[in-house]
């Protein structure tokens, strides 16, 4: 009988969006326990080795991390399997680079470079609000931060802007129709659009209808919606493609047009 935590992850069972091939080895890095779920995170080793190509092997990643070059959300992280996830800011002071982990329209984490100004804050979705001991109100975010004494107007599903240096809330966006959102789960993962309406289903999942910039509409569960801007102005810079998913035919036409213009 197995007792205790699982310590391994087979390569074939690793999340698809890590984009690991089957034949390079048997195992994949199992993310440490941390603020993001195993299937929704990107371990530091994969980000540095497979995405940025700053290292060739896991040992090299360890050497980079152990020199305390890598910061996530303003804190030095030396664990190579630390689970970085959606909206996390990864800073490498040595090269002066900052990245924000955001999904592209294919549902993978894009290498999205940001300015040092933008690296000072992050957006967090409010998961739950409760009153703790001695009547102190608390708020819990999607990346497991607990913040005391939040603004009483902030409700569940709203998005808060957090200053990474102090961990304080600087601003918030209500979950409301007409606001810009990103889908963080399900079949529409990575798409960005404006919330058009919300269907309430007590006892089941609330469904939210979203319309993207090209006028395509789609629906997803409320739990997959992450508000990223007021009106249609995003509060963060968006990766290439601006979260508009093209159909296969549109992608093909775009590829051919690019080929002709370069050829």
Curated annotation (Swiss-Prot):
Source organism superkingdom: Eukaryota
The record's InterPro entries line, in alphabetical order, gives: KOW, Rib_uL2_dom2, Ribosomal_eS4, Ribosomal_eS4_C, Ribosomal_eS4_central_region, Ribosomal_eS4_central_sf, Ribosomal_eS4_KOW, Ribosomal_eS4_N
Q: Which residues form the S4 RNA-binding domain?
A: 42-104
- Which Gene Ontology BP annotations are present? translation
Query: Which keywords describe this protein according to UniProt?
Result: Ribonucleoprotein, Ribosomal protein, RNA-binding, rRNA-binding
* GO molecular function terms attached to this record: rRNA binding; structural constituent of ribosome
A single Gene Ontology CC annotation of this entry is: cytosolic small ribosomal subunit
Q: Where are the transmembrane segments?
A: none
Its family remark reads: Belongs to the eukaryotic ribosomal protein eS4 family.
Q: What is this protein called?
A: Small ribosomal subunit protein eS4
Specify the species: Cricetulus griseus (Chinese hamster)
Q: Please name the gene that encodes this protein.
A: RPS4
């Amino acid at each position: 009988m197995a007792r205790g935590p699982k310590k391994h992850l087979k390569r074939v069972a690793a999340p698809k969006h890590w984009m690991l091939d089957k034949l390079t080895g048997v195992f994949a890095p199992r993310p440490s326990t941390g603020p993001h779920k195993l299937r929704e995170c990107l371990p530091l080793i994969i980000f540095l080795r497979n995405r940025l190509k700053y290292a060739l092997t896991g040992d090299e990643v360890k050497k980079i991390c152990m020199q305390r070059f890598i910061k996530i959300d303003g804190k030095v992280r030396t664990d190579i399997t630390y689970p970085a996830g959606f909206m996390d800011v990864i800073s490498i002071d040595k090269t002066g680079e900052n990245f924000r982990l955001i999904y592209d329209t294919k549902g993978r984490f894009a290498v999205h470079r940001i300015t040092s100004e933008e690296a000072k804050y992050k957006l967090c979705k409010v998961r739950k609000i409760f009153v703790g001991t001695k009547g102190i109100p608390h708020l819990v975010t999607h990346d497991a931060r607990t913040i005391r004494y939040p603004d009483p107007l902030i409700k569940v599903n709203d998005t808060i802007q957090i200053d990474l240096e102090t961990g304080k809330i600087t601003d918030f966006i209500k979950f409301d129709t007409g606001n810009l959102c990103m889908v963080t789960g399900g079949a529409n993962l990575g798409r960005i659009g404006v919330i058009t309406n919300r269907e309430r289903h007590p006892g089941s999942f609330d469904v939210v209808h979203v319309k993207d910039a090209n006028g395509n509409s789609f629906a997803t569960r409320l739990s997959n919606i992450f508000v990223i801007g007021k009106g249609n102005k995003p509060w963060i810079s968006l990766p290439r493609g601006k979260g508009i998913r093209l159909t296969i035919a549109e992608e093909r036409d775009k590829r051919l047009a690019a080929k002709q213009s370069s050829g």
